[in-house]
Amino acid sequence: MSLVLQARRSGKYFLLIDNLLVVLGFFVVFPLISIRFVDQLGWAALIVGIALGLRQLLQQGLGIFGGAIADRVGAKPMIISGMLLRAAGFATMAVASEPWILWASCTLSALGGTLFDPPRTALVIKLTRPHERGRFYSLLMMQDSAGAVIGALIGSWLLAYDFHYVCWAGAALFVLAAAWNAWLLPAYRISTIRAPVREGMLRVVRDRRFLTYVLTLTGYYMLAVQVMLMLPIMVNDIAGGPGAVKWMYAIEAALSLTLLYPIARWSEKRFRLEQRLMFGLLLMTLSLFPLGLSTTLQSLFALICCFYLGSIIAEPARETLSASLADARARGSYMGFSRLGLALGGALGYTGGGWMYDMGRSMNMPELPWALLGIIGMLTLALLYWQFSLQVPCATHQPRSS
């Protein structure tokens, strides 16, 4: 086996373990924020929505800067410092007794993610070949789902004792992830050239196709982030307690572990990336319209299953399509900027979702926020169809970056 092949293989194993630690650390804490501050402390959903939206907007919106710096200095120092900063954010959240403290903790967490997320994503592109990238993304997403339910189970168990333990567990996992990277991650360069930070950023913003694609995904992310805000609140309301929330993530894990990889392999041979992304988004959108009318856990979980299935179809295609559009000369910058749609969609989805949920409750119209989200999904589908119809379809197996 050549040294290059050996490095790729060991690198992929490293990425899987690193990803598991990051996912566990995140999902121990974040799914329980809305339950802790809305249901247990009685804060308005809007306040918590602002905190979650602020985290999303800062982390993903500033990602291009983190990616551009990583293009210049390499992945390792950015990843380690970012993980330690997120650990500090979680430790601060443990003592959040006022909204501004919660917002500050989410800001620290966001800045940490700004540093470590783009170089980690760029490493996936560097260490995988184009033809295997989609399947590796599927493996990572399967791991995300399993890690999400395990993290939520750990967090729910710790929440029964004290929310402090939830935050400290999340912080400890990110410190462990930082130590893992400090010990084993080589000093990889994630781009083919070592260009100035400004040059990498300019290369991205001049790429009109990539820019349009990223901004169009804002609506997609407005739907996707409700897994962290409105869906847990609704499950909690119908069940009468937070214990059922872990089953929501268990459903996602079961579907992902059994269907994600087979669906990705089957569909990549038969459909273009654009078609897979749009069909998944359509399924997510259609599942939202009747969600507000659910009165039992059975009907609610059935619709959540449809939502997750749409995400299972769309996510590998979306991630692979983003990688295929990235320029290898500025991988970090491209992967950082690719999160801008998540930044905007997350901020709007969290703050708007919290506001719509409060509004629907005050007007005794629980279906209102879900209907509005469904309309947003339909508009996003129309924009994606228009964008893809004007461009040459992206090949499934031959991305530009390698």
UniProtKB/Swiss-Prot annotation:
Keywords attached to this entry: Cell inner membrane, Cell membrane, Membrane, Transmembrane, Transmembrane helix, Transport
GO cellular component, as recorded: plasma membrane
Any single Pfam family the record assigns to this protein: MFS_1
Transmembrane helix as UniProt keyword: yes
PROSITE patterns, per database record: MFS
Localization per record: Cell inner membrane
Its membrane topology: Multi-pass membrane protein
Regions that span the bilayer: 13-33, 34-54, 99-116, 139-159, 165-185, 214-234, 244-264, 277-297, 340-360, 368-388
One function term, GO molecular function aspect: transmembrane transporter activity
Superkingdom as given in the UniProt entry: Bacteria
Coiled coil: none
Family: Belongs to the major facilitator superfamily. DHA1 family. MdtH (TC 2.A.1.2.21) subfamily.
Record protein name field: Multidrug resistance protein MdtH
Gene that this sequence comes from: mdtH
